[in-house]
């Protein structure tokens, strides 16, 4: 026990030394600014309102103190101990200017300026009688700022009146009153008033008032009502310019599809233009079909100007993936009989054809390391309608650099060819979406040869035809009415064939598989809305295969009536899975991320289990990180050679349940940390006598594998390098009552570390 006290005393001494060392480097007469505190006094607000207001006001105070971690200031310490670098490179320069941060001095704190900022914010929130005071407290060479705010009563909105007359503009402004953000009974808030001006501006611009702006609106505040209330009057400023009061229509539409940035936007000459489908097009080489513009530009001559259509048109042209830059402008046509704007679109195309090579490095939690070389050729305008054709060839290898397995090397060689057409191609129907995102019809054809050296070769053919479209920035759909997979094994070695008798899972790997069906995927995410405190990601998939041939041939594996198509037993099943993620910000640089995965496959007719390539797996760097990839389940089943001396694990199932949660926080500079817990398993839908304990049952919760650990993430801006160290605390294959193994955790034991610690190295976050 005494030695632990010594360690504790040593840690305390080191912490104190680090804290004191930061102030000894300060210039003479200076003190270190360690932050500010603000107290909300008075009884006009309840406790929760005071807390929220305090957080808001504290965020306004400047400067920010040096960052603190576990009571220390590591960045300031790094800055100090680096001294003065002699050159603009090297370790000391990196430590001082990349990792470290200079001391925030008390002399740089402007109490009066911060007091006025707080006072102003309170008044903007309707606390018109607020009082704010500020002072400092010193402790040796450290200074803390203290602010005291007495908000007083918050003024509420009594009434909202839209002032109007007979003019077209003011009638249009008044017509927006039904959707006003200013509500009687709500607190006065300057930000809401600014939002109301922007709302009116957006609505007015959609009615042709191109030159109108939010600055042309005035909201007068009458605080003489009494009883801490105000009356608001919304009106158009009397000095609003004449052009801002006029509603404009669209005149001629000019398109320059081969525009160079070296040209000037003043080039509005009608020479060399051809009038087609309502557009004046300057395209002597006929690079693009006119239908590209008619599907992408939402204006037509004679339409009332609409800013929404302006934004949609630019976004649609950009989303084609054919143009590098898209710019547009509007010019008043003074010779027109009515107020008219001519529209100009300047399109700078990307190179029509491109060739791209990539070299990738991979490392997996099953000790496989490898590399991939790929070469892609792309044509961004294959048939003149902005169709994108991509032909990709690739080759890769994976070798085992550690572990107990023999490590049979894996080689892949394949090609994947896709044609993406920027519209829906539906037989007997023709329609177009009216949002900023381009709908696409996609065709894919691929072939791959996978060779597990000394074991077997798999020949895979893939083909699909379908659609991809977005409803909006949050929702995306992908539908493939036709999806084909054909896998044929060859060159199966005698060694592998002999091993199948001892490991039934190995037989699934080399089964001939033929899958023909349809797939649908729906994705919802609000992660692009970074200002939200919580974010959600949802993805659901449905996969249906073998129904039509199954109905025609009447296949039923239970009675032995299995059917063959093109020389292979085709798969028949329904499969669905969902991936739901929730992100909760717990601080400025910390969050809790959680995920749940539910997967269910129902094999029937011609199949007793899902085909191997469609089954669910758990374990690995993006799953349950305390277990090797594909090594968990199904259920409590465990292969007798549990250490997988001969071959790497490849356990799978028809049903999947997985939970993950991790606490993410910023440590310093580019280094982030995480603490995590993972749980899950897979099961078979039907009973398999060769895999006892693998079938799903009511005791599934008692069969979950659980692991925990911690990790570091190195955020290099262009990629995130992730390292996770995990270990199991629950092993489902053990007997009931002995599955929890948390009491066996012993980091000091070499054998425990060898059998349980799993190191994961990966790119990007696991979810």
PLM segments and residue spans:
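A generic beta-sheet turn/junction motif
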Residues: 138-140, 153, 544, 587, ...
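C-terminal outer-membrane beta-barrel translocator/porin domains of Gram-negative envelope proteins
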Residues: 275-282, 362-366, 478-665, 675-699, ...
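Interaction-mediating elements
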Residues: 2-8, 18-319, 325-328, 340, ...
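Extended hydrophobic-aromatic, low-complexity segments
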Residues: 326-327, 355-357, 367-368, 384-388, ...
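Gram-negative/organellar outer-membrane beta-barrel architecture
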Residues: 169-172, 286-287, 306-539, 625-626, ...
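In a subset of proteins, long, contiguous C-terminal domains/tails are tracked
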Residues: 5-7, 522, 537, 564, ...
């Amino acid at each position: 026990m005494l030695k632990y006290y010594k360690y504790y005393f040593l840690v305390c001494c080191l912490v104190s030394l680090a804290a004191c060392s930061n102030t000894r480097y300060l210039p003479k007469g200076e003190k270190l600014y360690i932050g500010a505190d603000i107290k909300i006094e008075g009884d006009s607000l309840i406790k929760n309102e005071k807390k929220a207001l305090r957080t808001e006001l504290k965020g306004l105070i400047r400067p920010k103190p040096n960052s603190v971690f576990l009571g220390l200031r590591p960045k300031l310490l790094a800055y100090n101990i680096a001294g003065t670098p002699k050159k603009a490179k090297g370790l000391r320069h990196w430590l001082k200017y990349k990792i470290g941060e200079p001391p925030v001095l008390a002399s740089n704190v402007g109490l009066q300026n911060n007091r006025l900022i707080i006072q102003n914010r309170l008044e903007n929130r309707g606390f018109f009688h607020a009082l704010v005071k500020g002072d400092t407290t010193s402790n040796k060479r450290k200074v803390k700022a203290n602010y005291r705010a007495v908000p007083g009563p918050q003024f509420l909105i009594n009434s909202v009146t839209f002032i109007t007359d007979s003019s077209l503009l003011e009638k249009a402004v008044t017509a927006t009153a039904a959707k006003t953000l200013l509500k009687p009974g709500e607190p006065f808030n300057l930000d809401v008033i600014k939002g109301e001006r922007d709302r009116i501006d957006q609505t007015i611009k959609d009615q042709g008032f191109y030159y109108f702006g939010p600055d042309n609106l005035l909201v007068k505040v009458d605080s003489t009502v009494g009883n801490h209330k105000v009356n608001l009057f919304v009106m158009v400023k009397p000095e609003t310019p004449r052009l801002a009061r006029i509603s404009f229509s669209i005149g001629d539409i000019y398109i320059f599809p081969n525009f160079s940035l070296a040209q000037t936007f003043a080039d509005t000459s009608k020479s060399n233009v051809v009038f087609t489908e309502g557009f004046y097009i300057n395209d002597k080489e006929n690079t693009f079909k006119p239908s590209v513009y008619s599907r992408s530009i939402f204006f037509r001559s004679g339409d009332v100007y609409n800013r929404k259509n302006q934004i949609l048109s630019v976004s649609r042209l950009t989303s084609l993936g054919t143009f590098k830059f898209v710019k547009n402008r509007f010019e008043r046509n003074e010779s027109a009989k009515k107020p008219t704007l001519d529209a100009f679109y300047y399109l700078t195309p990307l190179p029509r054809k491109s060739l791209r090579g990539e070299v990738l490095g991979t490392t997996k939690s099953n000790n496989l390391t490898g590399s991939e070389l790929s070469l892609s050729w792309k044509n961004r305008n294959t048939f003149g309608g902005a169709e994108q054709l991509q032909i990709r060839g690739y080759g890769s290898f994976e070798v085992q650099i550690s572990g107990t397995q023999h490590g049979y090397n894996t080689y892949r060689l394949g090609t994947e060819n896709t044609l993406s057409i920027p519209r829906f191609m539906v037989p007997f129907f023709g329609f177009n979406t009216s949002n900023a995102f381009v709908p696409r019809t996609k065709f894919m054809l691929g072939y791959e040869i996978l060779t597990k050296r000394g074991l077997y070769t798999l020949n895979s053919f893939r083909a699909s035809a379908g659609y991809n479209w977005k409803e909006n920035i949050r929702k995306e759909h992908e539908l493939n009415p036709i999806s084909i997979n054909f896998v044929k094994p060859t060159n199966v070695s005698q060694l592998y064939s002999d091993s199948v008798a001892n490991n039934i899972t190995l037989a699934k790997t080399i089964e001939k598989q033929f899958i023909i069906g349809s797939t649908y995927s729906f994705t919802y995410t609000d992660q692009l809305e970074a200002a939200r405190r919580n974010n959600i990601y949802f993805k659901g998939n449905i996969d249906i295969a073998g129904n039509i041939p199954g109905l025609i041939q009447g296949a039923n594996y239970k009675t032995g009536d299995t059917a063959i198509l093109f020389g292979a037993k085709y798969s028949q099943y329904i499969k669905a899975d969902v991936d739901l993620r929730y992100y909760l910000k717990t601080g400025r640089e910390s969050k809790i991320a959680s995920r749940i995965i539910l997967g269910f496959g129902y094999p029937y007719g011609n199949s007793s289990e899902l085909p191997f390539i469609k089954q669910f797996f758990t374990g690995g760097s993006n799953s349950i990180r305390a277990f090797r990839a594909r090594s968990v389940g199904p259920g409590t089943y465990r292969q007798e050679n549990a250490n997988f001396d001969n071959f790497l694990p490849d356990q799978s199932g028809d049903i999947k349940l997985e939970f993950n949660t991790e606490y993410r926080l910023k440590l310093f500079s580019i280094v982030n940390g995480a603490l995590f817990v993972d749980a899950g398993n897979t099961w078979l839908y039907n009973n398999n006598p060769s895999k006892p304990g693998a079938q799903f049952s009511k005791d599934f919760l008692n069969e979950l594998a659980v692991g925990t650990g911690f990790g570091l993430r190195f955020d290099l801006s262009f990629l995130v390098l992730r390292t996770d160290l995990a270990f199991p605390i629950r092993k489902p294959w053990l007997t009931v009552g002995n599955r929890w193994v948390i009491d066996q955790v012993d980091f000091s034991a070499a054998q425990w570390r060898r059998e349980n610690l799993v190191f994961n190295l990966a790119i990007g976050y696991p979810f």
